Amino acid sequence: IKSTQEAYNIKVKETSIDYSGTIKEDEVEKNDDVIDNITIVNKNLVKKSLKDTQTETGYYIYNSVSLAKYNINGKDQLTYVAPREAENNTISYNNKTYEYTHGMGQIIASATSVTEDGNVEYLQKDISGSDNILEVKEPRIYYGVETNSVAVTNTKNKSEYDYTDSDGVEHVNNYDGNSGIQVGFWDRLILAVKNKDIRLAMTSSISSESKIITNRNIVKRAKAVLPNLIYDENPYTVVDDGKIYWVLDAYTVSDKYPYSTYTEVEYDGAKRNINYIRNSVKVIINAYDGEMTFYITDRNDPVIMAYLTLRYFLIIQEKKFQMELSNK
């Protein structure tokens, strides 16, 4: 049992709590911060509400919903955060490649309260940013969980769609980030073969100023750098310095820890037995330009320290990992 606990990093501390059998008013007052942040809204309810009320245009999808605590109006509040990603499965090839190239901002809902009608209470939902409580300066999401297609930016006679405001005016934008590559015909032909999309080579929409953005799925992007880690399938977003970042948890595993109990896990469609696991890496991905940083969060993990020796130039090692969340 001890070996298994060590291998899985299970640290259980038993604590006895004195309970009188009744709750007094002063006890409630002392713990009002805890009581105010008790989750009463179910995640699935938020997902359903988003699908019913926020996807009427068909351009966006909200599959990544996660709990997060933000300081809103001077008070810590437990919320659900859902990045607004572009829906690429229901629109045409030209639209998703040249116009609907990116998602737009985040929706934030309260996890601790509902409206008077019992519906989900949205704290931030306006795509134009009029209720931008986290002060996001760059809301566009070019890299995410749903971004599985190539995007071409700065094309001839086409601008990228941002949103339509309440007056019916379409707002557009041209990508000016560091990501993407500017290529000629032969390079486009190679990319077309690699992506099994000959239209990239044959199109007349691409100019010398255009950029082709590939490898936009953040999980696949991280795997391409460190393929030996296991990556969480439910990354979440945070806001730092006005920018949206994805946080992707990564795990090291082994099946060779002495005397530890085996567990069967399924990953990438295959099953394997492991008896050691550590959540020793966090990957931070900029949602706008795809820049990735790998942070070691557990320096006592011998597996990740071995990777550091082999691929030291790929990982930034920190004694303490912390990303400050922008708040209002």
What is each stretch, according to the model?
Residues 1-328:
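Soluble extracytoplasmic regions of secretory-pathway and membrane proteins
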